[in-house]
Design a protein with these regions (language model features):
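N-terminal export signals
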Residues: 7-28
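Aromatic-residue-lined binding/catalytic grooves and analogous aromatic/hydrophobic interfacial grooves
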Residues: 115
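Extended, low-polarity segments enriched in aliphatic/aromatic residues
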Residues: 27-88, 99-101, 105-112, 120-368
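N-terminal secretory signal peptides
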Residues: 1-4
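Hydrophobic alpha-helical segments, especially transmembrane helices
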Residues: 6-7, 228
Length: 368
């Protein structure tokens, strides 16, 4: 059954604006883009059996996925929910997160359930593309081993480098420009002031699903939905956190996500919080700050989602006797002088979603 979208929600539209020194980008304008069909709505689904004995458990995760997407949309069933966002002929990208492997990455079971949902909406496997920036990180995490037959994989470049100004895999027609460079670069050179969007997004897919994880981040404070987009879809991101004291994540992250091609093509966020990392992120610390949270989060609004995830991380830190993320100071596992989770609030001010807790509609489900 295909559900009339108008029966679920009054759709919002917003014109994407340039930020700071401007941007050049365009996307296929549509009402599905950020903040999406359900601004301010965040559905969390908990199941204590989703990770047991050190392993992800398929059946509980499948139940969580089905309940979460239905409750997010208000659709009568799993198939109708997916058809609200996707249809036959769409080419859909899935932005995974391999950073922090093997501790906290987008898990195979959630990824495969997303692909199953796309299939129900009429999207064939050949029209699904799973992506991360770096080929080597993608392969080291093992994503290629998890994909159903026919699903494609993609990346922008071979591996991480500290300069990130190469254009292979990036689109010269889509970029965010701001007056921010790495030390020693010519600040008058437009190329070093720009971050270009991956061709994966600009040329190869027409819709994007964001599959972030639940983690602390030394420079950004938290790495959730917004940062998975900003630092996974463009180049020249090292300038946003060049050193422990030269940190501009607070403004860089929302500036990138505000690019029309990102904002308009990103239609759904599924935050994998089955495992979380409450300190020492983004990389692993041999499981030192790892915990089983057993929860998936569903949203079309990355700001409301990240505000929720940030509060989850702060609650876990409080349980461990640690200060909130925004007040944290450098230590042996987190070296930045001042992390910048305020990127979430700034994104809200740009119209990328709902920041105010009083306006966030949190729907909390416990399946066992």
């Amino acid at each position: 059954m295909i559900v009339d979208r108008r029966s679920f929600v009054t759709l919002l539209t917003a014109a994407a604006s340039s930020l700071l020194y401007g941007c050049k980008s365009s996307g296929a304008a549509g009402k599905l883009g950020i903040p999406g069909l359900f601004p301010g709505r965040v559905v969390s689904v908990h199941h204590s059996g989703s990770h047991t004995g050190g392993e992800f458990q398929l059946e509980p995760i499948r139940s969580m996925m089905r309940r979460g997407i239905v409750d997010l949309t208000g659709a009568p069933d799993w198939i109708a929910a997916w058809r609200l966002f996707f249809e036959r002929g769409d080419v859909v990208g899935i932005k995974v997160n391999p950073v922090g492997s093997p501790d906290v990455i987008s898990c195979a079971e959630v990824l495969r359930e997303i692909i199953a949902g796309l299939n129900e909406a009429g999207v064939t496997n050949k029209d699904v593309v799973v992506y991360d920036r770096y080929r080597r990180q993608f392969l080291r995490a093992g994503f290629q081993n998890w994909l159903p037959d026919g699903v494609r994989q993609d990346w922008a470049v071979e591996d991480y480098d500290g300069i990130q100004l190469g254009m292979e895999g990036y689109d010269p027609e889509h970029y965010m420009e701001m007056a921010l460079t790495q030390p020693g670069q010519d600040a008058h050179d437009p190329h070093v002031r720009r971050s270009y969007v991956a061709q994966f997004l600009t040329r190869r897919v027409n819709k994007l699903i964001n599959l972030p994880v639940l983690k602390h981040h030394q420079s950004a404070g938290v790495t959730l939905a917004l940062k998975n987009l900003s630092h996974g879809l463009v180049n020249n991101v090292c300038r946003s956190h060049s050193s422990s004291t030269l940190n501009a994540c607070g403004i860089f992250i929302p500036a990138v996500v505000n690019l029309p091609v990102i904002r308009e093509k990103t239609v759904l966020h599924v935050l994998d919080g089955i495992l979380g990392m409450y300190h020492g992120g983004p990389g692993g610390r041999n499981g030192k700050y790892l915990w089983a949270h057993h929860t998936l989060y569903f949203a079309t609004d990355p700001v409301a989602l990240d505000k929720t995830g940030w509060q989850v991380l702060d609650a876990k830190r409080a349980e461990k006797g640690m200060t909130p993320v925004a007040l944290s100071r450098p230590d042996e596992d987190s070296h930045f002088l001042n992390c910048q989770p305020e990127h979430v609030e700034i994104a809200g001010a740009l119209g990328l979603g709902v920041w105010d807790d009083k306006k966030i509609d949190r729907r909390i489900l416990d399946l066992g």
